[in-house]
Amino acid sequence: MQAKGLWSADEIAALSYGHYTTQLPKQGLPDPSREWTLMAAVIQIESVEDTKVIKKVVAMGTGTKCIGQAKLRKTGDVLQDSHAEIIAKRSFQRYLLHQLSLAVSDTKDCLFIPGTEKGKWMLRPEISFVFFTSHTPCGDASIIPVISHEDELGHPLPSEVTEKDHSSNNVCESVNTTYKRKVRSEEDIGFISKKMKHSIDEILTRPENYEEENRHDFPSTCQKALDVHRTGAKCVAGELQDSYSPGVNYHTVGVLRIKPGRGDRTMSMSCSDKMARWNVLGCQGALLMHFLQQPIYLSAVVVGKCPFSQDAMERALYNRCHKVLSLPCAFRLNRVQIIQSDLEFQHGRHALTKKDATRKLVPCGAAVSWSAVPHHPLDVTANGYRQGTTRKAIGSPQCRSRICKAEIFNTFRELVQRLSEKQRSESLSSQGLKTYWDYKAAAITYQEAWNCLRQQAFTSWIQTPRDFLMFS
């Protein structure tokens, strides 16, 4: 159930900013004299009357960093992606696991009610979730034009172009704004990507199984665009690549991207790509689908005051997936509501730069996770481990983030072990379930939905190698 019209984007932003200020520790937050960060949150909306809702933050994350391939571990004890959106989503999964634990204990005041399938639960109909992010997600959603200072920081832009990565700078040049949309032939009908033209007369080189579907021009309001926000994020191999032409032709839009690393390339897909995946598979992940009859979709995404384009957000978060067919029962393309707030995040780079344009700012190296759980709601990490971890201590349980794969898996297994055979879903009754990957693979409908999405829309998605998922 969506409580449309009973909350505003500014209310969601104000609630998130207030929670950030009052509930997160100073440890892990940026020093505003020299550092900036990004913040994301999940807000639970409960409809109590036709004209009233209760709003509360149930998960929050801050962060700007990812670790490179060389630092990945096969034990699942390091956080691979510490961008704010991903920290918030993993914190939300921790909250959902706690709520499922309450449901299993027959606690009335929890999110879930018994489903119609054995061992499965459903979200109460009066509950929905809104995702707040202080900034446009890195990747395709951030591919927007630089027009003017006022438009850049204040109002939605109707254009179709570029990503401003979490640590990139802006460069302004001038050019035209026409681009082509390409799609694969019938074999990969849902795979959509778009390529900026070098000029009107130039024909792009492409594989034989690509064909031009249509061409779009930017609205006349965007003809004054000087450039696009540049990014260090690279297009995934197998996708159309960036042309690096001057100005607005610099980037390819609609393609999968990898988050940048400092020297050591990451394996983390952009936040735009991951959020698009959530709009088909849900935010709960594979493990929690063993308990849930339906995926948990976001009802809305609210973006703080920042460079923003409605068209780019819609393209990135669900239009790229609009031709995905034959999803298993309960899965669908979630056309999430997307709105922008006029309230700016106090510790964002734009807000801090406006106060003093001469100071040199760097992204904060720490990430903070907060979940609405009774025990140890906070988690502060750096470089994928608890803040303060030494090289010698890496590998010990004390150094793990509470939202790393290994810890989420431990919490999940503790919940499974509390269930009798009669209480377990069919998928949990499978024989030989031992490793993290075993349990993920056993969530059959989730894996079927993921296969549909990957085969029809995200064919070049980079997956974590299997040997990094075999821990128990």
Swiss-Prot record:
Cofactor(s) listed: 1D-myo-inositol hexakisphosphate
A Pfam family annotated for this UniProt entry: A_deamin
Residues that, per the record, bind 1D-myo-inositol hexakisphosphate: 90, 274, 277, 405, 440
Record: residues binding Zn(2+): 83, 138, 271
GO terms of biological process kind: tRNA processing
Keyword annotations: Hydrolase, Metal-binding, tRNA processing, Zinc
Domain A to I editase as annotated: residue spans: 59-471
Active site: residue positions: 85
Single GO MF descriptor: metal ion binding
Co-factor note (free text): Binds 1 myo-inositol hexakisphosphate (IP6) per subunit.
Catalytic activity from the UniProt record: adenosine(37) in tRNA(Ala) + H2O + H(+) = inosine(37) in tRNA(Ala) + NH4(+)
EC number: 3.5.4.34
UniProt family annotation: Belongs to the ADAT1 family.
Designated name of the protein: tRNA-specific adenosine deaminase 1
Gene label: adat1
